[in-house]
Curated annotation (Swiss-Prot):
This is Glutamate--tRNA ligase. Catalyzes the attachment of glutamate to tRNA(Glu) in a two-step reaction: glutamate is first activated by ATP to form Glu-AMP and then transferred to the acceptor end of tRNA(Glu). It comes from Delftia acidovorans (strain DSM 14801 / SPH-1). Its EC number is 6.1.1.17. One of its GO terms (cellular component) is cytosol. It comes from the Bacteria. NCBIfam families: gltX_bact.
Amino acid sequence: MTQKVRTRFAPSPTGFIHLGNIRSALYPWAFARATGGDFILRIEDTDVERSTQASVDVIIEGMAWLQLDHDEGPFYQMQRMDRYKEVLAGLQASGHVYPCYMSVEELDALRERQMANKEKPRYDGTWRPEEGKVLPPVPEGVRPVLRFKTPQGGVVAWEDKCKGRIEFQNSELDDLVIARPDGTPTYNFCVCVDDMDMAITHVIRGDDHVNNTPRQIHIFEALGASVPVFAHLPTVLNEQGEKMSKRNGAKAVTQYRDEGYLPDAMVNYLARLGWSHGDDEIFSRAQFLEWFNLDHLGRSAGQFDEAKLRWVNAQHLKALDDAALAELVRPFVLKTGLDQALLDADDRLPRICALFKDRCETLVDLAGWVRLFYVDAFDRNAEDLAKHVTDVVAPALDAFAEGIASVEWSKEAIAALIKEVLKAQGLKMPQLAMPVRVLTLGTAHTPSVDAVLELLGREKILARLKNR
């Protein structure tokens, strides 16, 4: 029987979660969903000084917005300390762990000597017990660290689902500290115990963890646990070509939500930052899950491009049903200060969305257009105003306003009125349409003027044509 896939996302709650982080949640989530497996959320909060509940909340909020649901968790490492110490005691009993009394000062001096000799700085095994070896006398009043006995000789290797075969010489690995003098276990040990206890089958994470992997494989083997399949994802770079991080300006995932991006568009864009399905650039969440596998993970770093993200979002926005889009844009319209009673007074919102969605990249863009149909005061583009609303077209605007006051209210009737005024005034379409657009919506660039005016309504058109 094939083992059920179990993946995990294990962030440290030391700040907000950015796009580089969330991609490391997206792929294991997608792999679990694509294979009928389980996705586990684990919070690695052993850095007590920097970890905060507020950061945990932001992580969960960002994942919830992107609809990256977890089947188990969140589990907190700080709540599992008794379990770690229990497993650690077992490793001590089996001879895989030993106490090391080397002081920080002694370690520093050792490293300085090694570097002076152009050697790789590393622990030299002074306190490692071996047959026939006499250990130094145990110093009084010193609490030891616990070190893991790394196998000597040979290699440790794995077939990485993203990078191919990776191997390390065991001789390059020193004996890892897995418990501090106060008894608290260290990161690499906790991770292995968690993955063992949670039966994780696939570890899909950033390639900054590659150097941890040989050590973790040794710990898994010492525990008698199954070694999971590893996939180390290439780095996500920012627009300047640097590794994306909080320190160099990366935005929180939730900020993209507030800027009007759609969760499915974000999933689409992030999926393409390290995975591909042929030349397909735009796809739904369902298609992504149908297509996703670990065989098509890329090996080179993906570079974030906000212009491309906006384009992807625009494609998803256009594809949305008008009624669904109206519900999504509603809170963004209300954030502009518009009274909800005005928005709910009629059923124009889905039709306005239908008319303008092809011109928008985000829900914030669309909300800006929607607002113009309900407010009394709004800004006009000064350059468009000077260019198009001139004394030459004033008679045509007056004639058009007179016609609007009494015309039958339909898009077709308004279109007929425009043609009638053009003919009577001897003008071409842009000479009337452009100033009407500027006066009624503040810009010369709008969809079809008859469609816009039909939705704007007689009263607002007359007031705006008069105010010139």
